[in-house]
Amino acid sequence: MAEVVTGRFAPSPTGALHAGSMVAALASWLDVRAQGGVWLVRMEDVDTPRCVPGAAEQILSQLAACGLNSDRPPMWQSSRGAAYGAALAQLVEAGLAYPCACTRKQIEQDALAAGHLHLRQAERVYPGTCRPERGGLAGRAARAWRLHTARAGGSAAVSWSDRRLGRRSQGVEAAVGDFVLRRADGLWAYQLAVVVDDAAQGITDVVRGEDLADNTARQILLQRALGLPMPRYLHTPLVLAADGQKLSKQNGAVPVAMDDPAGVLRAAAAVLGLTLDAGRPVGETLAQAVALWRAGWLAR
């Protein structure tokens, strides 16, 4: 059976879509449409405390105004706990996941004591304090669950080819450490959820912003550990704020107004290097964008 190209747009409903998230939405849609595939929307609402009531509905309304409609009903991560639990159980049974009792303060102390001075996003890389071979919980109560990156193959470099960024590689154990699969507050971690959901939805092509490229090695490691297929990856250019950082809700990004959806599409396409004609309705604007994507991005 021939492969059905399947892509997805997976926003977190912490607010309405801004200019940066519109670029990611359009890119993932164009990539699928240019290949005659299936485009899906997934609401990554696994971090429920951060979700804003009504944001998911607002996001779906913005997408619909721009002609970007999911080919199936959206998936909601908040309803997927059983699937994530099954994946964690599989990892535990294989000896690839373990419970962790460490607080952030203890991680900081243990990392410094072990000479691990490397900071990752202002936090210490987890030094493996609760690994089973180091004594495990040692009588303490479990707080979280972590992937044993060494046993999962993360000591060696995890390599992949990005359709835009080229050959990429990361030694997950050294760069990230044993990352969290289930958090101390009981919520499922993003890395596990996205890997399980990509496989469940048959995602063949992950198209997302370049800021998420750093997650790829961890996700590939989990895919291998769970025996799941690895999709192709394409990380797109970012929209930058005035301070040169990625545009986000944290640095002043405002919701995209939908009084001119075709104009919103043209602006997003421009970030992707696509120049679209002004004055066309949404349907014609999207058709032109698909043709340009097929001639440009797919031809790479």
Swiss-Prot record:
InterPro entries: Glu-Q_tRNA(Asp)_Synthase, Glu/Gln-tRNA-synth, Glu/Gln-tRNA-synth_Ib_cat-dom, GluQ/Sye, Rossmann-like_a/b/a_fold. GO terms for biological process: glutamyl-tRNA aminoacylation; tRNA modification. ATP binds at residue 249. One of its GO terms (cellular component) is cytosol. A motif ('HIGH' region) lies at residues 11-21. A motif ('KMSKS' region) lies at residues 246-250. Its EC number is 6.1.1.-. L-glutamate binds at residues 8-12, 44, 190, 208. One of its GO terms (molecular function) is ATP binding. The keyword Magnesium does not apply. Binds 1 zinc ion per subunit. Keywords: Aminoacyl-tRNA synthetase, ATP-binding, Ligase, Metal-binding, Nucleotide-binding, Zinc. Zn(2+) binds at residues 100, 102, 126, 130. Its cofactor is Zn(2+). Belongs to the class-I aminoacyl-tRNA synthetase family. GluQ subfamily. Catalyzes the tRNA-independent activation of glutamate in presence of ATP and the subsequent transfer of glutamate onto a tRNA(Asp). Glutamate is transferred on the 2-amino-5-(4,5-dihydroxy-2-cyclopenten-1-yl) moiety of the queuosine in the wobble position of the QUC anticodon. PANTHER family: GLUTAMATE--TRNA LIGASE, GLUTAMYL-Q TRNA(ASP) SYNTHETASE. This is Glutamyl-Q tRNA(Asp) synthetase. It comes from Leptothrix cholodnii (strain ATCC 51168 / LMG 8142 / SP-6) (Leptothrix discophora (strain SP-6)).
